[in-house]
Amino acid sequence: MQSAGLSYDEVFAEADALGYLEADPNLDVGGIDAGHKLAILSSIAYGVQVDFDAVKLEGIGQISIDDINHAADMGYRIKLLGVSQMTENGLEQRMTPCLVPETSPLGQLEGGTNMVVVEGDKVGQIVLRGAGAGEGPTASAVMSDVLDLARGIRIPTLSLIHI
C-alpha cells in the first residue's frame, strides 16, 4: 500500500484479483489465517498441542493510511507479525501489526512474500523467505502434504491437532 501509493480499497481489490485473499477476507485482515499458521508452526517448534484460541490476534483492519504515512516518516513500515516464544509462563503467541525498520528484511517484504525468522541460542537467526500467498504456493503446499501422506511420511503436527 505504502510503496505503491494505493488506497486500502485498491490494495484489497488487487490482492483479491491475485488470489491472495481467503474466501472470507476477514481471515486475512483480522490476522486469523496468519494466526492459525503461527499456531501450527509453534506446535512444530515446541512440540506442543496446536491451540488456535491461544493466539492473541490483532489484525490490520484498523490501520489507516495516516498510520502508514506516519510510520514511513519515522523510517518504519507496519507489518503483521506473528511472534511465538516459550517463556516461564508457557507458550506465548501473538499476531499483531508491528513497526519494523523499512531497511530491514521484514521491512522489505512486498506482496505475497512471507518470511519466517527462527532464533536459537546456538545458531542465532535463521531466515526463510518465499512466496506465501496465491494459488500457486497454496496448491504446492497442499500437494506436498498430500504426497507425504500418500508416501506414509509421518507429519508430526497431525497428532497435535484436534478438530
Which stretches of residues belong to each language-model region?
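Substrate-binding/catalytic subdomain of NAD(P)-dependent oxidoreductase enzymes
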Residues: 2, 9-108, 113-115
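C-terminal catalytic subdomain
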Residues: 117-159
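Short acidic/polar capping segments at secondary-structure boundaries
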Residues: 3-5, 123
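Conserved small/polar residues in nucleotide/adenosyl-binding loops
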Residues: 161-163
